[in-house]
Amino acid sequence: MKASISTKLDQLAERLDEVNALLAREDATANMDQYRKLSREHAELSPVAEQYGQYRQAQDDLATAQALLDDPEMKEFAADEIDAARERLQSLENSLQTLLLPKDPNDDRNLLLEIRAGTGGEESALFAADLLRMYTRYAERRRWQVEIMSESPSDLGGYKEVIVRIAGDAAFSRLKFESGGHRVQRVPATESQGRIHTSACTVAVMPEADEVGEVEINPSDLRVDTFRASGAGGQHVNKTDSAVRLTHLPTGIVVECQDDRSQHRNKEKAMKVLAARIKDMQLRAAQAKEANTRRNLIGSGDRSDRIRTYNFPQGRVTDHRINLTLYKIDMIMDGDLDELISALSAEHQADQLAALGEES
């Protein structure tokens, strides 16, 4: 094990002792915020310290076995013990390196998923609806909740733009690599000659701010417009200005919500989307800065990056970031995304491990 990693592990073990002492104090629960913070830190440090303890025990076992090599009667036994200890040490070192990887603080958050039709006109809007169904089915498989926050339907039942909130266990950690350009190649329903068309959508996955107040939005930086919601008319036509448009002047971000009949509810939804977009902008700026100093294969989430192609005639889906092609497009479009997502997560972890090796 590299000296820098060993030093880091010693420091974490010492910190766990300090946290244990603080949690054992009689007045530990006097400040509940501090108590919860220490409890979370304890939960994060304990697995690392436990594995490091096993690693040090394996080091002791190796030293003991090596000392037995000089004894002719114990030589064969000692050689077997040395092989076993070395194998155990390597396995534990790999586990410890993984545990030391930087945690994404947003991994446990809920998220806002935004799908926008791009090149390809009505076919692109129809594909946006297909992508929404794909992610909704995936969410259902994982027992997550999906709520439409804002939608702009197209004439043929697709979406020019749709934003949904997805809430559930580790939702952002599973879907955060979906940001980018999604390209589809297929014969559109509107095509009479049977020609294959190429169109595209962009997907943005944004961690939800725990509270809108988590993202600082100065009221003076906000322009609020209300207007009458558009709809199909009839008896449910909206006769009040319930639709809300928020414009964040410093960034130029504009959010509209008109799906609810309550202006208050529409404004509440719009504020959630606005806060997530501002937070996402801040995250991408930080990631761009990080990418200047080291390779960041998966996590850039640049909207202009074409990340995936869905080729219906060939029945394949290709993720261009990791050169993975799967010939099960129907299953994937029905929400079977785990193989894709797990491969992306594994590549990201390998990228982090390589960076950890460079730093140490």
From Swiss-Prot:
MF GO annotations: translation release factor activity, codon specific
Record-linked SUPFAM superfamilies: Release factor (SSF75620)
Name of protein: Peptide chain release factor 1
Principal location: cytoplasm
A cellular component annotation (GO) from this entry: cytoplasm
Compartment(s): Cytoplasm
Residue ranges of coiled coil: none
Similarity annotation: Belongs to the prokaryotic/mitochondrial release factor family.
Modification sites for N5-methylglutamine: 235
